[in-house]
Regions:
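Chitinase-like catalytic core of GlcNAc-active glycosidases
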Residues: 1-207, 213-214, 221-247, 260
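Extended serine/threonine-enriched, polar tracts that run as long, contiguous segments within proteins
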Residues: 212, 254-256
Length: 265
């Protein structure tokens, strides 16, 4: 019931001003038809969310002025296209914060990003009288990677944690990308490989329970299970999990089946 539209792109080559310019002509679409189909989905109770970031469009706010442009440009897109929310999918260059901490941020660019998201949500509520949906789709490196002494802080491991912690009351769903990942630690300090029940269970439990991050990064308090999704690819690739394995894993995660691997909840 939630449709993600990817991605908002850079406007004028600036990484803090965003635009939405789909290549409609490639697919026989027009902006009018796109908006009409969005409206139809919304009339059926579905939500359509604009995804921001991705590997192709890094976003970094280096100054107060850039934050203001960022907030304004996204607000304009929400109004023009009638999206129900935003998905924060920052990757790579967008997360190269320096000397950050979970509770005190540290890097002014991280502070601007958190403040900017809060302002976007506040402005949307004032204009529309309802909450803007907020989801996030970080890579494992920037969440559970916060438990790795090797990744924190020299490789920006855990860089998403300050944002998740600061915005936890506003986040509607966190979908960590449990794919395209190297081995990652669980709460038991053991490392698990993707495409396995243990990987899915260990990394999902860490997000729900919270953890003390490595190298004095701070404490991540976790999110309610109702706000935690399991982000997996539906086609074969790096991190693909066979359907039968996934079904058994999810049943155990939900308390409806036996333990499918070595990791015990």
């Amino acid at each position: 019931n939630v449709i993600m539209v990817s991605f908002a792109s850079q406007k004028n080559g600036r990484d803090y001003e965003l635009n939405f310019v789909p290549e409609f002509s490639k697919y026989g679409f027009t902006s009018t038809l796109f908006k009409s189909e969005m409206a139809q989905l919304q009339s059926e109770g579905k939500k359509v969310i604009l995804s921001i970031g991705g590997a192709t469009y890094p976003t970094m706010l280096d100054s107060l002025e850039e934050k203001e442009v960022f907030v304004s440009s996204i607000g304009d897109l929400l109004e023009e296209w009638s999206f129900d929310g935003i998905d924060i999918d920052l990757e790579g260059k967008s997360l190269k914060f320096n000397n950050f901490k979970i509770d005190s941020f540290g890097d002014h660019r991280l502070t601007f990003m958190i403040e900017g998201i809060k302002e976007i949500m506040a402005d949307y509520y004032i204009k529309n009288g309802k909450k803007l949906l907020l989801t996030m789709a970080p890579e494992t490196h920037y969440v559970q990677g916060g438990m790795s002494e090797n990744l924190v802080p020299n490789k920006h491991g855990g860089a998403y944690l300050p944002m998740i912690e600061a915005l936890k009351d506003s986040i509607d769903m966190l979908n960590v990308q449990l794919y395209n990942s190297g081995a990652m630690p669980g709460l038991d300090s053991n490392y698990y490989n993707q495409s396995t029940p243990d990987f899915i269970l260990a990394l999902t439990e860490a997000v729900i329970q919270g953890f003390t991050a490595a190298n004095d990064l701070g404490t991540f308090s976790g999110l309610p299970a109702s706000k935690v999704g399991v982000g997996l690819p539906s086609c074969k690739g790096w991190g693909y999990t066979e359907p039968k394995v996934l079904e058994a894993t999810m049943k155990y995660l939900l308390g409806q089946g036996p333990q499918p691997g070595e990791y015990k909840l």
